[in-house]
């Protein structure tokens, strides 16, 4: 009897921990070395969840380059049934595909442009939305759950107002809605938190430029992601059940209007 109880309990633990979270993103999310002044918000996510987090975000990548460089295939090879894949992209998708190997076409349509890359190869480049839809489809094909997340804001101020509208975040939201998958409005909660600090204090979290945070700033962006999950407007996030007591203790930024 004792053996049966121990076996059953162990089985429950394995079952509960079987699913994991994988992250596809860029330098705002990626892990940095211990001696680096910068850090990405994905580094801290496991501190607030009861799931293992595999942060596969890579510096400088867009949806297009993440796929083209084989990083997406590597992520998929590590993705199992019932896993959760968070996709937060957009910072590096902006630009002209004719001159940048990472830029995508703006928007979410089916437009394409044929370009010659810096390696001399011919490539058909799609819209940001097209690449997101591909990622969504690939994750679903693995029996896993894709979650689209709005990108964290840059530290751009006009007087005392932090920029809150980011076209690629809006595009990501539109793709998620049209695809019937979950969207986490990380952008809104990141903006709300840094707006509450004002421009001078907010700048202290961006030591090198207006995009990349230090370690404290990264933790704040993780906490704003957790708040966005907890306060999701349209239904309950699949991640909600996995927020641990540390995550549940986060109170700022407060719930934002839907």
Annotate each PLM feature:
Residues 13-16, 48-50, 141, 178:
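Short, well-ordered coil/turn elements that cap or connect secondary structure elements
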Residues 62-74:
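N-terminal post-signal-peptidase region of extra-cytosolic proteins
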Residues 29-30, 60-62, 153-156:
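Short histidine/acidic/glycine/proline-rich micro-motifs that form metal-
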Residues 1-19:
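Fungal secretory targeting signals
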Residues 225-258:
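Charge-patterned, long linear interaction tracts outside catalytic cores
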Residues 74-215, 219, 226-238:
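Alpha-helical cap/lid subdomain in secreted, periplasmic
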Residues 16-59, 73-85, 103-108:
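Serine-esterase "nucleophile elbow" of acetyl-processing enzymes
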Residues 33-36, 66-67, 158-163:
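Short, solvent-exposed loop/turn segments at secondary-structure boundaries
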């Amino acid at each position: 009897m004792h053996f049966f109880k121990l076996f059953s309990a162990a089985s429950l633990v394995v079952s509960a921990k079987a699913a994991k979270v994988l992250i596809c993103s860029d330098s705002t999310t990626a892990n940095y070395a211990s001696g680096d002044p910068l850090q990405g918000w994905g580094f801290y996510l496991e501190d607030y969840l009861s799931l293992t987090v595999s942060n596969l975000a890579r510096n400088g990548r867009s949806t297009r380059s993440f796929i083209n460089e084989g990083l997406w295939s590597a992520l998929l090879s590590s993705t199992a049934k019932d896993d959760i894949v968070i996709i937060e992209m957009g910072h590096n998708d902006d630009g002209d595909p004719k001159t940048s190997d990472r830029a995508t076409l703006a928007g979410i349509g089916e437009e394409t442009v044929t370009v010659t890359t810096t390696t001399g190869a011919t490539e058909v480049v799609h819209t940001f939305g097209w690449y997101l839809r591909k990622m969504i489809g690939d994750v679903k094909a693995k029996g896993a759950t894709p979650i689209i997340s709005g990108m964290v804001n840059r530290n751009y101020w006009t007087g005392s107002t932090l920029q809150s509208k980011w076209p690629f975040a809006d595009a990501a939201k539109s793709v998620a809605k049209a695809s019937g998958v979950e969207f986490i409005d990380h952008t809104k909660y990141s903006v709300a938190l840094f707006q509450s600090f004002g421009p001078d204090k907010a700048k202290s979290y961006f030591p090198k430029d207006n995009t990349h945070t230090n370690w404290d700033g990264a933790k704040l962006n993780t906490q704003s992601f957790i708040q966005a999950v907890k306060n999701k407007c349209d239904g309950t996030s699949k991640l909600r059940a996995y927020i641990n007591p540390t995550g549940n203790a986060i109170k700022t930024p407060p719930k934002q209007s839907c």
